[in-house]
């Protein structure tokens, strides 16, 4: 079997940076399979996207874009004739340099929010508000927490692309993002995207390391966002929910129809619910968003123990 091929696209420790490149079967001497595949690294130019580094991965059936400048988020994708993602007013991807996370009372995160899958965290992941932490002198101090934390607005310091030939050749993209400050928590997020040639699936593996010398708080939320063709009036969330609880009084208004999505409404105020999902003995579980007719659906799988 042909040995795995690898390319380092970014390595700040060794001053390595590749602005653009394209990898195809022909360029690396591999046979074309599954309709052909490609991986392209580029840097966007113009508007709020200026300077954003992206990697476009096409496995011959599924294609998706990973944002190296935005916490290794998954921006958008296409599978067959289905688009994957949503149409955000932010119209990104937005370079974090244009995002002030503390503006509008900590809601600045929304200015760059338009990924299909974006990570929230790592020190905090929820709504903006005040928190009490130890300062550099060991005294309790009040600080402002912004919406959904910092990790989605931090660039990868190390990025590596791997092609693993085999019966089902794999494309693997690894990125390392650090959220760290002196006298503050220090996190290292290592993200790995893996997809096989010709498949309709991408696996995402995240490892978070505390590289400080003392324990720290840790939170992470996967903010997953889908529009048409999966989301339409009457679309349903299909999930093994043992218990569903409204997040607030607004969510409680429609708790009886928590799994059914309405048509777009001007001025709609979001409704969010908490779920306790049934899982297999090993902790694995899943959920699916399907359109009203049941002809299109997207499934997410994860492990409750992780």
What residue ranges belong to the model's regions?
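Surface-exposed acidic/polar loop and edge beta-strand patches at domain peripheries
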Residues: 1-197, 201-203, 226-234, 239-263, ...
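Asparagine-centered strand-capping/turn motif at beta-strand->loop junctions
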Residues: 66, 207-212
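Short, hydrophobic/aromatic beta-strand segments
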Residues: 77-78, 214-221
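Aromatic side chains
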Residues: 187, 222, 273-275
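Generic detector of well-ordered alpha-helical packing
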Residues: 206-207, 224
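Short coil/turn motifs at secondary-structure junctions
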Residues: 210-213, 227-229
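Surface beta-strand/loop "capping" patches
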Residues: 271-276, 281
């Amino acid at each position: 079997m042909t040995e795995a091929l690898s390319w380092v696209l970014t390595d700040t420790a060794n001053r390595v940076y590749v602005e653009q490149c394209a990898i195809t079967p022909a360029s690396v001497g591999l046979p074309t399979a599954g309709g052909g595949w490609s991986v392209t690294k580029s840097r966007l130019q113009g508007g709020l996207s200026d300077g954003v580094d992206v990697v476009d991965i096409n496995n011959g059936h599924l294609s998706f874009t990973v944002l190296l400048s935005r916490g290794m988020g998954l921006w958008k994708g296409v599978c067959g004739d289905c688009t994957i993602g949503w149409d955000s007013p932010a119209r990104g991807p937005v370079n974090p340099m244009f995002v002030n996370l503390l503006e509008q009372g900590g809601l600045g995160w929304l200015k760059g929010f338009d990924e299909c899958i974006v990570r929230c965290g790592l020190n905090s992941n929820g709504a903006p508000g005040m928190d009490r932490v130890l300062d550099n002198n060991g005294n309790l101090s009040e600080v402002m927490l912004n919406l959904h934390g910092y990790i989605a607005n931090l660039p990868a310091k190390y990025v590596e692309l791997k092609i693993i030939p085999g019966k089902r050749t794999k494309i693997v993209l690894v990125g390392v993002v650090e959220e760290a400050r002196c006298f503050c928590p220090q996190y290292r997020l290592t993200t790995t995207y893996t997809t096989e040639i010709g498949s309709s699936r991408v696996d995402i593996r995240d490892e978070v390391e505390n590289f400080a010398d003392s324990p720290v708080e840790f939170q992470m939320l996967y903010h997953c966002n889908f529009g048409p063709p999966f989301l339409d009036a009457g679309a349903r969330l299909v999930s093994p929910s043992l218990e569903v609880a409204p997040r607030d009084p607004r969510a409680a208004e429609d708790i009886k129809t928590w799994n059914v999505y309405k048509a777009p409404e001007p001025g709609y105020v979001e409704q969010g619910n908490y779920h306790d999902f049934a899982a297999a003995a090993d902790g694995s579980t899943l959920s699916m968003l399907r359109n009203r007719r049941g002809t299109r659906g997207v499934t997410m799988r994860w492990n409750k123990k992780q």
